[in-house]
Regions:
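A short, sequence-level motif marking secondary-structure junctions
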Residues: 17, 88, 146, 251-252, ...
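Active-site-adjacent loops and short helices of periplasmic peptidoglycan-processing enzymes
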Residues: 33-206, 210-219, 282
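Hydrophobic alpha-helical segments and their boundary regions
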Residues: 10, 17, 67, 125, ...
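Domain-terminus/edge residues, biased toward the C-terminal soluble/receptor-binding domains
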Residues: 185-186, 197-202, 206-328
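An N-terminal domain-start capping segment
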Residues: 16, 25, 97, 247-251
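N-terminal secretory targeting signals
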Residues: 1-69, 317-328
Length: 328
């Protein structure tokens, strides 16, 4: 069995690229400002931001949440039920991987063999999520997609990007941007397949929901996100028994397990903060929820609050062409 050593480090300065000033963790008098204090201040500020859908006349009032931007969308029609800064450019972190894996599922068969180059393995940031694959080893595409969606493995994302582009993982960015445009995205620019920090890699709550409409329509990908354990058996292509637990708390057995969940993907970097894109279905209505620049565990709580708001206040009805009114 392969054991993993995951490095962790604390960033002393967070550079805000999108109009937010640099936050320093040292007070001028020499006292340290705690991360908890900064987190609480971020939450309080985000909760004070306007929810644009609440300004619509006779629209059900949506919940106050701690995400900087968020959206609740009907998956089938694209109707927006809740809107909070939905076109604001945000860093997606690992929620990027729903686009990467969607493209892979559309372009590749699950039994294709993916080679791991030196660059794919070593271009990831220290301490970022990985499964400790070595250069020269191979996995099937199905194993790769499971590793990406269950473990959020960054080196696997690079390898899949190289496999699809036929060259370098950097060239995969053009493929991502082309597909995002086809899906209706209007605020995004992608430069890597895993969401590792880059000022030129951004999206919005609206765009993630649009990508989510295609991603969550794929039953195989949804099933992967809901799988409790990543288990890759040793083979002639790689020698180790790889096992990793899915840490997603919305899935069955999680602390915030949501009974109507269809699938989900989290993301986190110091700048992006906590992001989450998810889908739930109840009584024939399928909703997609995106929360961005949130905090942990608030992003779980906010997601549940938004799903509950949607299922409690809206329903889909079929209206005959001969009818002019429909009473609910």
């Amino acid at each position: 069995m392969r054991f993993f050593k995951h490095l962790s480090y604390r960033t002393l300065f967070t550079k805000a690229v999108m109009g937010i000033s640099v936050i320093c963790l040292f007070a001028s008098d020499g006292l340290t400002v705690s991360a908890t204090t900064i987190k609480e201040e971020n939450i309080a500020y985000n909760q004070s931001l306007a929810v644009q859908s609440n300004a619509v006349a006779n629209w059900p009032t949506g919940p106050v949440i701690s995400a900087e931007s968020a959206i609740l969308m009907d998956a089938d029609t694209g109707a927006i039920l809740y809107a909070k800064n939905i076109h604001q450019k945000e860093y997606p972190a690992s929620t990027t991987k729903i686009l990467t894996t969607l493209i892979a599922s559309e372009r590749c068969s699950m039994d294709e063999i993916v080679d791991f180059s030196y660059d794919a393995v070593h271009d990831i940031d220290p301490g970022s999520n990985h499964i400790a694959i070595e250069p020269g080893e191979q996995l099937t595409m199905e194993e790769c997609l499971n590793a990406i969606l269950i473990r959020s493995a960054n080196e696997v994302s690079f390898a899949v990007a190289e496999h699809i582009s036929g060259t370098t993982w950097q060239d995969f960015g053009d493929i991502m941007n082309e597909r995002a445009k086809e899906l209706g995205c209007v605020d995004s620019h992608f430069v890597n397949p895993n969401g590792l920090p880059n000022e030129e890699h951004y999206t919005s709550a609206y765009d993630l929901a649009m990508i989510g409409r295609a991603f969550f329509a794929n039953e195989a990908l949804c099933k992967m996100t809901m799988t409790h354990m990543l288990h890759i058996l040793p083979s002639e292509r790689q020698p180790d028994d790889i096992m990793e637990v899915n840490k997603m708390e919305l899935i069955p057995g999680g602390k915030y397990a949501y009974p109507y969940l269809v699938g989900c993907k989290t993301g986190y970097t110091d700048v992006a903060r906590s992001t989450l894109v998810s889908c739930a279905e109840k009584d024939g209505m399928k909703l997609i929820c995106v929360v961005m620049k949130d905090e942990n565990p608030n992003y779980y709580e906010d997601t549940i609050a938004l799903f509950d708001y949607g299922f409690s206040n809206f329903q889909r009805v079929n209206i005959s062409q001969t009818e002019t009114k429909y009473n609910i």
